[in-house]
Amino acid sequence: MADTQPCDPFAEYGLADPFIPSDFFWQPGMLVAGVDEVGRGPLVGAVVTAAVILDPKYPIVGLADSKKISEKKRLALESEIKSHALGWALGRAESDEIDQLNILHATMLAMQRAVAALPVEAHAVLIDGNRVPALQCPAQAVVKGDGRVPAISAASILAKVARDREMYALHARYPQYGFDRHKGYPTAVHMAALEQHGALAEHRRSFGPVAAAIAQGNLF
């Protein structure tokens, strides 16, 4: 194994409620990836995941749950994470895969893809939430991990920024849906647009509001 030491969330990050890893995840030389997802709840687009292995020599100040920091801060942290992490990768499952598998299994698939795409092999993985996909290395779920494990916080930021960019691109094609504002979540604006303009090819047909629109013949 490499000589790299795992990040110490107590000494380097000062988290209010840090996750205390087992001795296994605390071994010298362990390269531990943090994994998180964004986009389980929206009615449109892919679920996007990220995997990040932080470099303990470059602790990144300001890491937090991506939902609790501003877009400007997320963009700044995205650049820093990509510049200083030992490895990072994105994964995804498209809307048609979500329809085929269901959102839970599609999310697990997207997480597997992110871990597999890492440029350096992770010896272990910490995953936000309470479920763990089948992986080639040991893994542990961490409830509210995006606020308790720095590497998961970093993954949440990369996934959020990546998916938001996709929603901005979709908004450029279909501005009448307001994707730049709600990012595909079932807000009143999105529901009204779905009823008025119909479902797009990018909409998740297995999700109730989209299925209802299609049943009424509302297709863009």
Swiss-Prot record:
Its main location: cytoplasm. A divalent metal cation binds at residues 36-37, 128. The keyword Hydrolase applies. Its cofactor is Mn(2+); Mg(2+). Keywords: Cytoplasm, Endonuclease, Hydrolase, Manganese, Metal-binding, Nuclease. It comes from the Bacteria. Pfam families: RNase_HII. It catalyses: Endonucleolytic cleavage to 5'-phosphomonoester. GO terms for biological process: DNA replication, removal of RNA primer; mismatch repair. Manganese or magnesium. Binds 1 divalent metal ion per monomer in the absence of substrate. May bind a second metal ion after substrate binding. Residues 30-219 form the RNase H type-2 domain. GO terms for cellular component: cytoplasm; ribonuclease H2 complex. It is found in: Cytoplasm. The keyword Ubl conjugation does not apply. GO terms for molecular function: manganese ion binding; RNA binding; RNA-DNA hybrid ribonuclease activity. Its EC number is 3.1.26.4. Endonuclease that specifically degrades the RNA of RNA-DNA hybrids. PANTHER family: RIBONUCLEASE H2 SUBUNIT A, RIBONUCLEASE HII. Belongs to the RNase HII family. This is Ribonuclease HII. It comes from Alcanivorax borkumensis (strain ATCC 700651 / DSM 11573 / NCIMB 13689 / SK2). The gene is rnhB.
